[in-house]
Amino acid sequence: MREYLTEHIKQALHKASIPASRAIKIEKPSDSRFGDFSTNIALVLAGECGMNPRQLAQKITENLSFSETTVSKTEIAGPGFINFYLEPAFIMKQVEQIITSSDRFGRGAAGEGKNAIVEYVSANPTGPLTIGRGRGGVLGDCIANILEAHGYTVTREYYFNDAGRQMSILSESVRLRYIELCGIAVEFPETHYQGDYIREIAAAILEKHGEKLVESDSTELFKQTAETHIFTHIKNTLHRLDITHDSYFNEHRLYQEDESGISPNQQVIDALRQKGFIDHYDGATWFMTTRLGQEKDKVLVKSSGEPSYRLPDIAYHVTKFERGFDEIVNIFGADHIDEYPDVIEALKILGYDTDRIRVAINQFVTTTVNGETVKMSTRKGNADLLDDLIDDVGADATRLFFIMRSKDSHLNFDIDLAKKQSKDNPVFYLQYAHARICSLLRIAENEAGFSLEEGSADAHLMGKLTSAHEIQLGFTLLDYPDVIQTCARILEPQKMVEYLHSVAELYHRFYQECPILKADPDIRSARLILSLATRQVLRNGFRILGISAPKSM
């Protein structure tokens, strides 16, 4: 509908000899008394045209030519808004396109021909996934789904941090536990990894190699074994939430030298030095962010020779540009808030178009039972494990609860609510709407011979639906493509959750107030078509969110 109205406004501007120099925005008023759609184009163009906004709005409306079967009324409101009131029959007849488009309904073309990379999870392979990482994983997976629905070709990537100090600590942790299992007392530092999984890895090494590694000075075997074991576990956990990746970028590649003997990390330092943004003092290599107005420079290479997180992150992002992605989306936890702006600044200095980078920060998660904060782990050394949460509430509840609040908001994950089999549980509420429609359609097919094909053929009957409940539901279903656009623009799947909840709420109300199977044949068919369309929108939305669409509950 927005495209339809936009095109007619463009034609009206052309007829009135008004240059359309600005984008035409069509919005839905928050109060239905002000129409089904509204535009502020007269307010936007008034200054350029040297006219009073209301006078300009009058001139535009005089040149609008709508069919009486589509737009019933156009009015000027306030300082110069133009409000449009659609014919209810026209709205309802559009519902047919939902059924004919099926799984394709809502898919856009804005990203056609463009490649996007979405990086998410990217947890260090030093232990099982935590709940916080899980929220970022679900957020990233949903955003990738949204961009695909928006027409993009999407690469889902995991940045595999297999280099640096944490990996050294991991390998040493396993080595010490291995020695301990060999019957030798060791002093295990508190700074090392404490979880039972470390002992499990050490036990596997002992079983395979015996005690011959006790005197070895090398930790490489311990590192490789731990890395393989932990990352396999991470991927299995993600698989439980139906989270997958197309590629895994290993951090160690950024330390590898090319034919000329220069690593990607060193290339970044050399390029920043040429731009005058590298300094060396206190034995370290510094990114001179004070030249950018910051209070302190940021270390890139520590005095120990170990790079800080910033250096490989900059080098990694350079590879994203070199791989030709049009859109670069990063899903970070709140612990990256202070770091990523420095990465952006470095990329700007190096000449990259950082407008192509979009960052989504997801805030922390706490879990509660009976209103009290709890830990989701019984394993010493690990707090809030994602596997334990999935075990407790299931994959669907885990996914939906992670995104039912804005990514910018701290999430209180209510375990009791997630396990409820009632309308209070948002997962149950949404899935029950889908199951209710499936049940209705089974009865309709068995008792009245209704089928999808017949429903599509009788779509003209939709114009017979005139009650407020029917029209509001139909109108809301047609919003689905706009919701996809909004989610893609702001990288916020929570908007899809809100929308689907409103669809379910409207359907439950329609179901209660408008008899379906006992209605006259034409009305019955039309209401079944409306139910089919609702089921399709719910299914498409569930696919975006990565939750199942049960046929019965």
UniProtKB/Swiss-Prot annotation:
Subcellular location: Cytoplasm
Keywords of this entry: Aminoacyl-tRNA synthetase, ATP-binding, Cytoplasm, Ligase, Nucleotide-binding, Protein biosynthesis
InterPro entries named in the record: Arg-tRNA-ligase, Arg-tRNA-synth_N, Arg-tRNA-synth_N_sf, ArgRS_core, DALR_anticod-bd, Rossmann-like_a/b/a_fold, tRNAsynth_Ia_anticodon-bd
Superkingdom of source: Bacteria
Motif 'HIGH' region location, chain numbering: 123-133
Keyword Kinase: no
GO cellular component: a single term: cytoplasm
Single GO BP term: arginyl-tRNA aminoacylation
One annotated GO molecular function: arginine-tRNA ligase activity
The protein's Enzyme Commission number: 6.1.1.19
Catalytic activity: tRNA(Arg) + L-arginine + ATP = L-arginyl-tRNA(Arg) + AMP + diphosphate
Pfam families: Arg_tRNA_synt_N, DALR_1, tRNA-synt_1d
NCBIfam families per record: argS
Family affiliation: Belongs to the class-I aminoacyl-tRNA synthetase family.
Subunit organization: Monomer.
Name assigned to this protein: Arginine--tRNA ligase
